[in-house]
A protein has these predicted regions:
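Conserved short strand/loop->alpha-helix "switch" segment adjacent to the catalytic nucleotide/phosphoryl-transfer site
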Residues: 16, 20-48
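Conserved beta-strand-loop-beta-strand hairpin that lines the nucleotide-binding pocket
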Residues: 1-10, 38, 51-133
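HAMP-domain connector/hinge
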Residues: 10-16
Length: 133
């Protein structure tokens, strides 16, 4: 389910269908803002990766996509187990699943700004930004 404000869409993530819905919407928003197809695809991939992590590790959470004048912002939030070693996750090569996904470190490389706040036992918030060029 998605909530919409004038420049923002919030998606409840509970399953793969929710992840696909958020990804498609994020792609459309990025294209609407004037991002080239390749850049819009990067935003969509990051939404998909973050949504997949919510589904796999937290069970549920939200992804919020916000349009700003010169950038798109993606915020993924959950109240799952948290990430014990954020630096290790950002360095790449760290996984707790057998998936072939891009992962957090790959998502970071696709965006212009990327930050993670996580507390073990309380959850994780990821903020990712792609600037319109």
């Amino acid at each position: 389910m998605a909530e919409r404000q004038s420049n923002q869409r919030r998606f409840s993530i509970k399953n793969v269908v929710d992840v696909v819905r958020a990804r498609r919407s994020g792609l459309g928003i990025a294209l609407e803002m004037g991002f080239h197809q390749a850049e819009a695809n990067r935003v969509a991939v990051v939404i998909s990766e973050l949504g997949r992590n919510i589904e796999l590790y937290a069970g549920e959470g939200t992804i919020t996509v916000t349009m700003h004048d010169r950038y798109i912002e993606v915020v993924a939030e959950d109240q799952g187990p948290g990430i014990p070693d954020v630096d290790r996750v950002l360095a790449g090569g760290y996984t707790t699943s057998q998936g072939m996904g891009l992962g957090v470190s790959g998502s970071k490389r696709l965006m212009d700004e990327f930050e993670i706040r996580s507390t073990v036992g309380e959850g994780t918030t990821v903020r990712a930004v792609k600037w319109l060029r």
